[in-house]
Amino acid sequence: MKIWSSEHVFGHPWDTVIKAAMRKYPNPMNPCVVGVDVLERSVDGCGRLHSLRLLSTEWGLPGLVRAILGANRTLTYIKERSVVDPAARKMELCSTNITLTNLVSVNERLVYTPHPENPEKTVLTQEAIITVKGISLGSYLESLMATTISSNAKKGWAAIEWIIEHSESAIS
Protein backbone atom coordinates (compact mmCIF):
# COMPACT_ATOMS: atom_id res chain seq x y z
CA MET A 1 0.00 0.00 0.00
CA LYS A 2 1.24 3.47 -0.87
CA ILE A 3 -0.24 6.72 0.47
CA TRP A 4 0.19 9.96 -1.45
CA SER A 5 -0.94 13.34 -0.15
CA SER A 6 -0.68 16.94 -1.18
CA GLU A 7 -1.96 20.43 -0.44
CA HIS A 8 -2.44 23.19 -2.99
CA VAL A 9 -3.61 26.79 -2.54
CA PHE A 10 -5.60 28.46 -5.30
CA GLY A 11 -5.48 32.25 -5.50
CA HIS A 12 -9.26 32.42 -5.92
CA PRO A 13 -12.25 32.41 -3.55
CA TRP A 14 -13.86 29.08 -2.63
CA ASP A 15 -17.02 29.56 -4.70
CA THR A 16 -15.01 30.34 -7.86
CA VAL A 17 -12.80 27.27 -7.40
CA ILE A 18 -15.78 24.99 -6.69
CA LYS A 19 -17.62 26.13 -9.83
CA ALA A 20 -14.48 25.34 -11.84
CA ALA A 21 -13.91 22.00 -10.08
CA MET A 22 -17.44 20.91 -10.97
CA ARG A 23 -16.64 21.63 -14.65
CA LYS A 24 -13.09 20.25 -14.58
CA TYR A 25 -13.54 17.64 -17.33
CA PRO A 26 -12.91 17.64 -20.17
CA ASN A 27 -9.86 19.89 -20.22
CA PRO A 28 -6.75 20.15 -22.40
CA MET A 29 -4.38 19.58 -19.46
CA ASN A 30 -5.49 16.01 -18.82
CA PRO A 31 -6.84 14.45 -22.01
CA CYS A 32 -6.82 10.94 -20.50
CA VAL A 33 -10.30 11.68 -19.05
CA VAL A 34 -12.39 10.90 -22.12
CA GLY A 35 -15.88 10.93 -20.63
CA VAL A 36 -17.93 12.11 -17.67
CA ASP A 37 -21.44 10.86 -16.97
CA VAL A 38 -23.60 12.18 -14.13
CA LEU A 39 -25.38 9.15 -12.66
CA GLU A 40 -27.11 10.89 -9.75
CA ARG A 41 -27.43 14.46 -8.52
CA SER A 42 -29.58 15.73 -5.67
CA VAL A 43 -29.81 18.44 -3.04
CA ASP A 44 -30.51 17.27 0.51
CA GLY A 45 -32.56 19.03 3.19
CA CYS A 46 -29.49 20.95 4.39
CA GLY A 47 -28.81 22.39 0.93
CA ARG A 48 -25.83 20.14 0.15
CA LEU A 49 -25.36 19.06 -3.46
CA HIS A 50 -24.64 15.32 -3.77
CA SER A 51 -23.29 13.97 -7.07
CA LEU A 52 -22.30 10.57 -8.35
CA ARG A 53 -20.35 10.58 -11.60
CA LEU A 54 -18.69 7.96 -13.76
CA LEU A 55 -15.37 9.03 -15.27
CA SER A 56 -14.00 7.18 -18.29
CA THR A 57 -10.22 7.39 -18.54
CA GLU A 58 -7.76 6.20 -21.13
CA TRP A 59 -4.47 5.37 -19.45
CA GLY A 60 -1.48 5.03 -21.72
CA LEU A 61 0.18 2.38 -19.58
CA PRO A 62 3.76 1.51 -20.53
CA GLY A 63 4.20 -1.94 -22.08
CA LEU A 64 6.14 -3.17 -19.04
CA VAL A 65 3.31 -2.23 -16.69
CA ARG A 66 0.70 -3.86 -18.96
CA ALA A 67 2.84 -7.01 -19.01
CA ILE A 68 3.19 -7.06 -15.21
CA LEU A 69 -0.54 -6.47 -14.74
CA GLY A 70 -1.40 -8.95 -17.46
CA ALA A 71 -3.87 -6.46 -18.91
CA ASN A 72 -4.03 -4.95 -22.36
CA ARG A 73 -7.07 -2.86 -21.47
CA THR A 74 -6.26 0.79 -20.92
CA LEU A 75 -9.82 2.20 -20.73
CA THR A 76 -10.72 2.38 -17.05
CA TYR A 77 -13.71 3.65 -15.12
CA ILE A 78 -13.76 5.66 -11.91
CA LYS A 79 -16.70 6.21 -9.57
CA GLU A 80 -16.68 9.72 -8.10
CA ARG A 81 -18.93 10.87 -5.25
CA SER A 82 -18.95 14.50 -4.19
CA VAL A 83 -20.73 16.66 -1.65
CA VAL A 84 -20.75 20.44 -1.93
CA ASP A 85 -21.82 22.12 1.31
CA PRO A 86 -22.27 25.84 0.62
CA ALA A 87 -23.15 26.63 4.26
CA ALA A 88 -19.95 25.04 5.60
CA ARG A 89 -18.05 26.18 2.48
CA LYS A 90 -16.60 22.74 1.91
CA MET A 91 -16.51 20.37 -1.03
CA GLU A 92 -15.47 16.77 -0.49
CA LEU A 93 -14.88 14.43 -3.39
CA CYS A 94 -14.07 10.71 -3.10
CA SER A 95 -13.20 8.53 -6.06
CA THR A 96 -12.30 4.91 -6.60
CA ASN A 97 -11.53 2.79 -9.61
CA ILE A 98 -14.16 0.26 -10.65
CA THR A 99 -12.04 -1.34 -13.37
CA LEU A 100 -9.15 -3.76 -12.69
CA THR A 101 -10.18 -3.93 -9.03
CA ASN A 102 -8.80 -7.46 -8.79
CA LEU A 103 -5.35 -6.01 -9.51
CA VAL A 104 -5.29 -2.51 -8.09
CA SER A 105 -7.36 -0.14 -5.98
CA VAL A 106 -6.94 3.61 -5.94
CA ASN A 107 -9.03 5.54 -3.43
CA GLU A 108 -8.70 9.28 -3.62
CA ARG A 109 -10.13 12.03 -1.40
CA LEU A 110 -10.10 15.74 -2.20
CA VAL A 111 -11.33 18.49 0.13
CA TYR A 112 -11.74 22.12 -0.92
CA THR A 113 -12.08 24.73 1.86
CA PRO A 114 -11.52 28.48 2.12
CA HIS A 115 -8.00 29.41 3.19
CA PRO A 116 -8.12 29.94 6.98
CA GLU A 117 -6.28 33.28 6.80
CA ASN A 118 -7.38 34.65 3.42
CA PRO A 119 -10.95 34.23 2.12
CA GLU A 120 -9.75 35.16 -1.37
CA LYS A 121 -7.87 31.85 -1.53
CA THR A 122 -8.91 28.18 -1.45
CA VAL A 123 -7.05 25.21 0.01
CA LEU A 124 -7.24 21.82 -1.69
CA THR A 125 -6.03 18.81 0.29
CA GLN A 126 -5.67 15.53 -1.57
CA GLU A 127 -4.91 12.00 -0.48
CA ALA A 128 -4.71 8.79 -2.48
CA ILE A 129 -4.31 5.26 -1.17
CA ILE A 130 -2.91 2.90 -3.79
CA THR A 131 -2.90 -0.87 -3.34
CA VAL A 132 -1.58 -3.31 -5.93
CA LYS A 133 -2.85 -6.82 -5.21
CA GLY A 134 -1.10 -10.14 -5.63
CA ILE A 135 1.50 -9.06 -8.17
CA SER A 136 5.25 -9.27 -7.90
CA LEU A 137 6.81 -5.80 -8.00
CA GLY A 138 3.65 -4.48 -6.32
CA SER A 139 5.49 -1.81 -4.32
CA TYR A 140 7.25 -0.66 -7.50
CA LEU A 141 3.89 -0.33 -9.28
CA GLU A 142 2.37 1.49 -6.29
CA SER A 143 5.24 4.01 -6.38
CA LEU A 144 4.86 4.40 -10.14
CA MET A 145 1.12 5.02 -9.73
CA ALA A 146 1.76 7.55 -6.93
CA THR A 147 4.06 9.45 -9.29
CA THR A 148 1.34 9.42 -11.94
CA ILE A 149 -1.26 10.64 -9.43
CA SER A 150 1.08 13.46 -8.39
CA SER A 151 1.55 14.47 -12.03
CA ASN A 152 -2.20 14.30 -12.68
CA ALA A 153 -2.90 16.39 -9.55
CA LYS A 154 -0.74 19.18 -10.98
CA LYS A 155 -2.62 18.88 -14.26
CA GLY A 156 -5.87 19.10 -12.29
CA TRP A 157 -4.75 22.30 -10.55
CA ALA A 158 -3.78 23.77 -13.93
CA ALA A 159 -7.13 22.70 -15.38
CA ILE A 160 -9.05 24.51 -12.63
CA GLU A 161 -6.97 27.65 -13.23
CA TRP A 162 -7.61 27.29 -16.99
CA ILE A 163 -11.38 26.95 -16.45
CA ILE A 164 -11.44 30.00 -14.15
CA GLU A 165 -9.41 32.05 -16.62
CA HIS A 166 -11.63 31.07 -19.55
CA SER A 167 -14.81 31.66 -17.52
CA GLU A 168 -13.65 35.15 -16.56
CA SER A 169 -12.64 36.03 -20.13
CA ALA A 170 -16.04 34.84 -21.39
CA ILE A 171 -17.77 37.20 -18.94
CA SER A 172 -15.65 40.28 -19.70
From Swiss-Prot:
Keyword Plastid among UniProt keywords: no
Limits of the PRELI/MSF1 domain: 1-172
Gene Ontology CC: mitochondrial intermembrane space; mitochondrion
Record-annotated site: Important for interaction with TRIAP1: 36, 49
GO molecular function, one term: phosphatidic acid transfer activity
UniProt main location, coarse: mitochondrion
Entry annotated with the keyword ATP-binding: no
Keywords: Lipid transport, Mitochondrion, Transport
Annotated signal peptide: none
Location(s), subcellular: Mitochondrion
Family (UniProt): Belongs to the slowmo family.
General function of this protein: In vitro, the TRIAP1:PRELID3A complex mediates the transfer of phosphatidic acid (PA) between liposomes and probably functions as a PA transporter across the mitochondrion intermembrane space. Phosphatidic acid import is required for cardiolipin (CL) synthesis in the mitochondrial inner membrane.
Subunit structure: Interacts with TRIAP1.
Protein name (Swiss-Prot/TrEMBL): PRELI domain containing protein 3A
Native source species: Mus musculus (Mouse)
Gene: Prelid3a
